[in-house]
Amino acid sequence: MKTGYIHRKSMNPCGLRFDSSYHLSDGVAVKRVIASSPYPLMPIEKAADRIFIGGRARRVYVKDREHGIPFLSSSDILQADLEAVKLASKKYTPNVEDMKLQKGWTLITRSGTIGNCAFANAKHAQKLASEDVIRLVPNNILREGYIYAYLASKQGYSLLTQGTFGAVIQHIEPAYVASLPIPVAPESFQQEVDDLIQESARLREEAADALQQAIQQVEDIIPYPSKKNVGCVSSRTILSSHNRRFEANYYISEGHDIEKYIYKNFKWKPLGQVCEDISRPDIFKRFYVQNGIVFLGGADIFLASPDSKKQLSKTKTTNISSLAIKENTILIPRSGTIGNVAWAHAGHAQKLASEDVIRLQPNDILRGGYIYAFLSSSIGKALIQKHIFGSVIQHIEPPHLKLIPIPVIEDSIIDNIHKLVIEYSKKVGKAIENERQAISMIEQEIESWTK
């Protein structure tokens, strides 16, 4: 429990807020540090052309890109994959231009997980975003990468979250963001930070292109069947199936049709044969600490910069070796967003992941990048989802994944797909490194003012 005294005058600048969460937050201490800056201060609104939330509209979703525009929620803007999102109808979505994002903007989540930031790159541009995303459009007074790195720093996060309000669904507002102080650092410092952020954005764009090329090569080889809703299944088929599955969607689904097509038209190997190991850790007692090892959940592995505020004790966690993520491992959640697949790059390495994340370690029979691209494609997703079980909380398990057929295609195509995935992995890893370096420069500079 935190306690403290506040002066009546300190309530005036914050709209006479009376809740203790505002006045006793970390943002208060950060504002004192920022006030001691050796550089001039200005409100962020002076470094921006606009700070706004975009239009609010009734959402009508469609299934094909011909009639829809990718629509990002506040959580989507933080994801590595910006393509696997809902599509808002072009015809029935009003004020589309007000909802579109542009490259170079700083995006801030304003509800739910408040205060998380993303730097809009070319993959965000021209997509729509919900009203739960604050858009900061920089002008030329401060470098756009510098503004982003400042708000994405731990000090920036404390400032953003201090303005939270609401009893049930909490928010921050553009007017509050506009009022936050930002130091006008020397041009050389701003330039160095901006260069790192811009390079990070460029690498992410190139990485996304490389991965999309790899996945497209897989989808060009195997046609995606149209869904059938009815069909006949013999009792012999049911009795000979894995675990004698009885659900209709196991036998009548895209995954089932794709499986039959692969059996008939390709040489193939079950996923269990082309992996050294497919497993997940056992359930364990978690000891959370302040300065431990980062612990990722099933959703965290898909973030553009995989991270979590949860950290596990290094001394009390007995199964660290089985929880640790190894680079070039394939990660699949066993519940939640089943069918999505992540490639463990430098941003994942040596972090821990929960028992809800299945690990696939490819062997030398097929290239790991090819296996990942296949499982990441619409083809692979349908094959994974075929094995879903559970009526309320749905799951898949390693024994089910081992059955998935992996087509054995020409070595040259496999090698090319693998190289593209490795290119994706290296560029994402470097992008995360650059971004963290830029943010760290901001944090260290601010911390130096208290010494």
Regions found by a protein language model. Give the residues of each.
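Short coil/turn segments at secondary-structure boundaries
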Residues: A57-E66, Q162-G163, N229-V233, I283-G292, ...
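A short beta-sheet element
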Residues: E97, T109-Y150, S321-L323, P333-F374
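Non-catalytic DNA-recognition/assembly elements of restriction-modification systems
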Residues: M1-A57, P186-D282, E410-K451
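Short, surface-exposed loop/turn microsegments at beta-strand edges and helix-strand junctions
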Residues: Y61-I69, L78, A84-L87, M99-L101, ...
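Sequence-specific dsDNA recognition surfaces
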Residues: L41-V60, S75-K103, K269-F284, A299-E327
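A short glycine-rich beta-alpha junction/loop motif
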Residues: K127-I134, G166-S188, K351-I358, G390-D415
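Well-ordered mid-protein domain cores that form the structural environment of catalytic cofactors
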Residues: I77, L82, N95, L107-C117, ...
